[in-house]
């Protein structure tokens, strides 16, 4: 995103992006369950749709808000700012998280309405058990590590594809189905479907996701040191190829063509910073901020 993108516009991008993600996750889950009684087949369809949708949404909304789509991703961005790096301020993080949660609920309700179901009916699928919480810690930690790791080694452009691929895999290799997204988890409690989660299961899942985010940050710091990806709302500047630290661009008051180049480069680089989102299928689909710069 550019340095001139207003917070309201970024919040709108997060709300719409997260809503779109939940429409994909919940809608594909409903469709899959209706078309096949085989849970494995339904999970394949749901995980594929969720991963493809997540990658496209990150690519589309990344230049606007960083496409966090996930409060955990947003919190990692805020933490980077608190520890002397670049990221979102406290007010921005709160606005992002609120927009993501509202979007997730709206997306789940919309998906229910599309299939002629009762919009807003709470899910009845209880997901409890310590093994599921461990699965959420692992899923969320991996998501944050993917985003942080790519951002810190100068490969942020790969985040949309990498996050989508990771979520598709995590849906299968984690016991919880990789919700990995507090906003998405809350939204899915409003859908009594294949991807739903009963309200009483929310506290444990959200707590596990927050813990997983902290673990992911710790692993990124351990593996890559203190190098941080640049913030999505940073001034126009060209990022260093490896560290991801913005380097000032010498002003050029010559032809407009040169000015365009100086402006376009940062926009493309910064779009690759924050994202997210975690989503899952039968058990979850973290969407996350996948994302361009990190946070998230």
Language model features with spans:
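Membrane-interface helix-loop junctions and terminal tails of multi-pass membrane proteins
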Residues: 1-296
């Amino acid at each position: 995103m550019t340095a001139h993108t207003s917070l309201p516009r970024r919040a709108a991008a997060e709300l719409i992006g997260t809503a779109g993600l939940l429409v994909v996750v919940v809608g594909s889950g409903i469709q899959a369950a209706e078309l096949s009684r085989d849970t494995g087949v339904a999970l394949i369809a749901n995980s594929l749709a969720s991963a493809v949708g997540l990658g496209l949404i990150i690519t589309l909304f990344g230049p606007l808000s960083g496409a966090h789509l996930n409060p955990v991703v947003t919190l990692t961005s805020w933490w980077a700012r608190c520890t002397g790096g670049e990221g979102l301020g406290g007010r921005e993080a709160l606005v992002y998280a609120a927009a993501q949660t509202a979007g997730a609920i709206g997306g789940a309700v919309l998906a229910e309405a599309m299939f002629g179901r009762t919009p807003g009916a709470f899910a009845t699928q209880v997901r409890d058990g310590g093994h599921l919480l461990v699965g959420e810690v692992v899923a969320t930690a991996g998501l944050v590590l993917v985003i942080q790791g790519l951002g810190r080694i100068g490969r942020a452009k790969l985040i949309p594809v990498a996050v989508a691929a990771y979520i598709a895999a995590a849906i299968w290799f984690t016991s919880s189905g990789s919700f990995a997204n507090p906003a998405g988890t809350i939204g899915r409690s409003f859908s009594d479907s294949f991807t739903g989660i009963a309200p009483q299961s929310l506290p444990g899942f959200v707590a596990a996701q927050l813990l997983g985010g902290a673990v992911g940050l710790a692993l990124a710091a351990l593996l890559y040191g203190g190098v941080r990806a640049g913030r999505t709302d940073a001034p126009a500047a060209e990022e260093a190829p490896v560290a991801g630290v913005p380097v000032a661009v010498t002003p050029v008051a010559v032809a407009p063509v040169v000015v365009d180049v100086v402006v376009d480069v940062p926009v493309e680089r910064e779009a690759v910073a924050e994202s997210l989102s975690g989503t899952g299928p039968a058990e979850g689909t973290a969407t996350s901020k996948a994302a361009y710069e990190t946070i998230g």
